[in-house]
Amino acid sequence: MCIALPYKYRIAPLYIYVEDKDVLSHIMPSKDDNANRIETKLNTLGLKLPEPLKVPTNVKTPFTWVRISGNKAYISGHGPQNPDGSVAGPFGKVGGGAVGESEVSVAQAYQAAKLAGLSILGSLKRELGNLDLVTGWLQVRGMVNAAAGFTQTTDVINGFSDLILTLYGPELGMHARSAIGVQALPLGLPVIIEALVEVSV
């Protein structure tokens, strides 16, 4: 078999003749090699991507969860979901003084941020078909439904960042990030996260 090297690797026309299929497989890996690498990692970690969000009937969503433009994917704000697509609790403000039924601990909010990450990955999978097509996590904006005076928003959104870095590694997964406290979030969610990623489409 004759292989023409891509232009950027040539100084002058160069052709290599390869007859051994094993050698050929190392020179030109199959498109299926390492296919679904990210989903394999998810399975190894015992994590499951949720079904599409089951939006409450009284909530209108005149927008798309993921918008592709060129090699960028703009991702709308996602909250935590259960595997069946329903909105995941607990609900209410994160932190605060008195312990109340509607309050959310930092540990619970960290887990909610992780679930929001899985929600985003689920939307990306439905849009791209393969999570391996994400070639870089560029920017993340995390919003925390913070009680008055709560300052541990960074600890909360680390739940998302830790997940992405575990799955994609620092080369692709390291991102610019904001973690801000807000007065309220839709449906009383403890966290909502939006992102900008680079994709290969």
Give the ranges of each region predicted by the language model.
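N-terminal presequence-like segments and the immediate start of the first folded domain
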Residues: 14-118, 122-141, 146-201
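N-terminal polybasic/positive-inside topogenic patches
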Residues: 5-11, 15-17
